[in-house]
From Swiss-Prot:
Ubiquitinated. This enzyme condenses acetyl-CoA with acetoacetyl-CoA to form HMG-CoA, which is the substrate for HMG-CoA reductase. One of its GO terms (biological process) is acetyl-CoA metabolic process. Belongs to the thiolase-like superfamily. HMG-CoA synthase family. It comes from the Eukaryota. It comes from Caenorhabditis elegans. Pfam families: HMG_CoA_synt_C (PF08540), HMG_CoA_synt_N (PF01154). There is a cross-link at K408 (Glycyl lysine isopeptide (Lys-Gly) (interchain with G-Cter in SUMO)). GO terms for molecular function: hydroxymethylglutaryl-CoA synthase activity. It catalyses: acetoacetyl-CoA + acetyl-CoA + H2O = (3S)-3-hydroxy-3-methylglutaryl-CoA + CoA + H(+). CDD domains: init_cond_enzymes. The gene is hmgs-1. This is Hydroxymethylglutaryl-CoA synthase.
Amino acid sequence: MSLGQLSYTPVTDVGIGAIELYFPQNFVDQNDLEKFNNVSSGKYTIGLGQQQMGFCSDNEDIVSISLTVTRKLIETYKISTDSIGCLVVGTETMIDKSKSVKTALMDLFPGNSDIEGVDIKNACFGGAQALLHAIDWVTVNHPLDKKNAIVVVADIAIYEEGPARCTGGAGAIAFLICPDASIPIDRQFSACHMKNTWDFFKPITPIPSEYPVVDGSLSLSSYLEAVRMTYTYFISKVNRHTTGIDGLNSFDGVFLHSPFTKMVQKGLAVMNYTDSQLRHKQLNGNGVDHKLDENDRAGLAKMIELSAQVWKEKTDPYLVFNRRIGNMYTPSLFAQLLAYLAADDCVTGEKSILFFAYGSGLASAIFPGRVRQTSNLDKIRQVAIRAIKRLDDRIQFTPEEFTETLQKREVFLRSKEIPKSPSETSLFPNTYFLDNMDKLYRRSYTLHEEPNGVQNGNGIHH
């Protein structure tokens, strides 16, 4: 018998069957940051479109937030750990140059070591690639063993003192990937644009640092180029293999990676204009006589004007997490899906959605998905609604306290004192935290539980 000749029934509608979101309890207000940094009023809140920024103290790292969100996913949806055959982590937040975050998550799967997958890294794009990889894995493997996959996208985004510090954030999202999913991803229509750029990177330097090197203008132009190229490739692929798509009009929600929400608005404007050029149609009845250039300020402003209705209906309403948490890196794109699922618009009929994923360096992709009225969709929607409400349960810190917290992270990272113990700061209930680093730099974690099982969501100090 040849193993390659085994026959089985293919699976359909592979995609997201369950979702959980974690974000830290700490946040700082962007209005306060404007005053603290002595910049003009509205520079962060209007110019960048940001309201608040979440951040982690030195007692949370990439492993702790990944443990937290994965455990929440398993418990919320009562997932059997024996049903998982693949676990992939998308992150650019590194605490080890060799050992993957995924290996630490194996502690949550006692008795099941047959779980494929490791970490995937390329700036903010690693999460999208992890999702696509898991979809491929389930498509191939589920017919044989009936096993599903889990994808974790998580990052802690912080910047050194200066103009970019206001664009940080932190968060983690976990997905269950399975057949007959509530949010299937039509992976066969994904299209990508890859290129060697130096718009944002984190070199290994003599002095340990969590901070990236950023070329702001190159980052913007690279992002907009990626939108144009991926959308062009996507429409070309769709037109070659199917009929009936009417560009962006075919989608009820359009989600783009969000370094900050004004960047999303610019990206959508380029996508909308590219859509018009490809279909040779006027936008909102306002045609343009000449080709617009996204790298020209006036041209981009015109694109934004022409895309106002699409922005209002398909993208802007779903940026609540991005505005109030900031740039979570890999989760930033998928936080918009959660906000969309919390809205009343998705409760009737099948909906079509579109994702644009981007990671500096650069890697980018567009892929479509659908929201189906399955038996599990209501559970997912309740998780999304609770996550939005949990934004109001966070603790506000002053800019001075925020700055001190980042200094604590620097001290913890660079201190030669071994073993190390981070400071004690507030956490949401049922959150893992970094407890200790021993003389071999091995990190240990503890689950912070609410006393007596009470979960008030208001945070306590442990």
